[in-house]
Amino acid sequence: MSSVYTRPLARLIEQLQRLPGIGPKTAQRLALHLIKRPEADIQALAQALLEAKQQVGLCSVCFHLSAEPVCEICASPQRDNHTICVVADSRDVIAIEKTREYHGKYHVLGGLISPLEGITPEHLHIQPLIQRASQPQVEEVILAINPSIEGETTTLYVGQLLRPFVKVTRIAFGLPVGGDLDYADEMTLARALAGRREIEWQ
């Protein structure tokens, strides 16, 4: 880090740059903004970060982020128990929920199969998904996974495991190849869900 920054400011900028989507210039702007804020604001921010880290874990059913053992979606009697939407990350749950078009349950895999990065099926929440999907009330599993190489690998792998005992569909590709669900606008996501289709097996 350049000597134009004092050491504490340089450390702050370095830490901010470690956040996703934050480059050097954005990190600098954020750091300069933060040090101008009242100390009470900074303490409140630090406290919120600590509390979120300490109190937010994973739902024991679907593995979505939750401050309780079972998340609000899984615990809600208003949600449709006949459908499970499978996503890679909690960000995808949030993106789909914003559409207000899906009323079933979710299952968060916790990533995508990526041999190059050493991520195998055993690293993901696939076995709990199979157990949930094999329950008699489940009629459909929707695979809402990003259309990347890793996403396609994961979709086909999970779909093959599920197809013997439940209907498996995937969202329509109104999404760009390699695009993340959480970057798609709500209308595009809603259409992708509405236009879902069964996977064509080779």
From Swiss-Prot:
Keyword Zinc set for record: yes
Keywords: DNA damage, DNA recombination, DNA repair, Metal-binding, Zinc, Zinc-finger
Domain (Toprim): residue spans on this chain: 82-176
Keyword Zinc-finger: yes
One Pfam family hit: RecR_HhH
GO biological process: DNA recombination; DNA repair
InterPro entries given in the database record: DNA_Rcmb_RecR, Hlx-hairpin-Hlx_DNA-bd_motif, Rcmb_RecR, Rcmb_RecR_Znf, TOPRIM_dom, TOPRIM_RecR
Zinc finger (C4-type): 59-74
GO molecular function terms attached to this record: DNA binding; zinc ion binding
HAMAP family: RecR (MF_00017)
Family note: Belongs to the RecR family.
Known role: May play a role in DNA repair. It seems to be involved in an RecBC-independent recombinational process of DNA repair. It may act with RecF and RecO.
Protein name: Recombination protein RecR
